[in-house]
Amino acid sequence: MARTDTDSWDLASSVGATATMVAAARAIASTEPNALIDDPYAADLVRKVGLEFFTKLVDGDIALDGDDAAAAGLMVSMMAVRTRFFDDFFCDAAGAGIRQSVILAAGLDSRAYRLGWPAGTVVYEIDQPRVIEAKTAAMAEIGASPTAERRTVAVDLRDDWPAALRAAGFDAATPTAWIAEGLLVYLPPEAQDRLFDNITALSARGSRLATEYHPDITSTLRGRGQAMSERWRDHGFDVDLSDLWYGGDRNAADEYLAGHGWQVSTRPRPEVFAAYGRTFPDLTLTGDDNAAMRQSVAITATRS
């Protein structure tokens, strides 16, 4: 179903289901030899959501072969590197003395529970109310305890989330570490700019931001999402990923941030893979455009 300006979701539908998909990838990546990440909660969170395809995937109860196996392997590889990149970003920010962090569109992100946060750190998680409620309940049932002071902000990012964040105790005078992981493709172009404007307005000097940017969203990612959805529909996952992503001309995230008071650093995706000792996968195995996907970049920025 195509997106609307007022659509909402839980963790088993629409955009929320992609959070479950990513958690499934983290769960599998955590069990690999020489794993890049360790997310001990991902598999249990996926099971709590109850989407049969992803539950079977993390439990090893589904046999994938050919293109299906290649697509799943690609997803796991991509998510392992992406997760580690954002993990390291938070750890580096904490090492620099930042004690206030914000996870935008937190989904099933478990960093507030699994990273070794310094004493006194506050982690804010922002997402839709049903998503926040479900994850909080699931973590309690699992018996997980946050490793930082976790504060939830149950609000749609299309609403006045800065006001809700402040109401939860956020201090705009204190440097903050922000992540927008896997988020920008789910925003219309103007909403992406508005997100960065709000982050900038809330960021004291020395604040840090990490995100990722895909220059060719329309022709590459939407086609990739449609192909992946078609493969997985046969296994019972009936969400068309290509319907969830917004195309259209948009400002390059790195250039926009640089023009709004941030010192920006970018790394192409293959370079990020290499930094973690991994080889960027051959995307032609799943019908993707290698050249276009190699142009996607990981962004880190510091408020000047």
Swiss-Prot record:
It comes from the Bacteria. InterPro entries: Ppm1/Ppm2/Tcmp, SAM-dependent_MTases_sf, SAM_mthyl_Trfase_ML2640-like. Its EC number is 2.1.1.-. Keywords: Methyltransferase, S-adenosyl-L-methionine, Transferase. GO terms for molecular function: methyltransferase activity. One of its GO terms (biological process) is methylation. Pfam families: LCM. It is an enzyme of class 2 (transferase). S-adenosyl-L-methionine binds at residues 127, 156-157. NCBIfam families: mthyl_TIGR00027. Exhibits S-adenosyl-L-methionine-dependent methyltransferase activity. Belongs to the UPF0677 family. This is Putative S-adenosyl-L-methionine-dependent methyltransferase MSMEG_1481/MSMEI_1445.
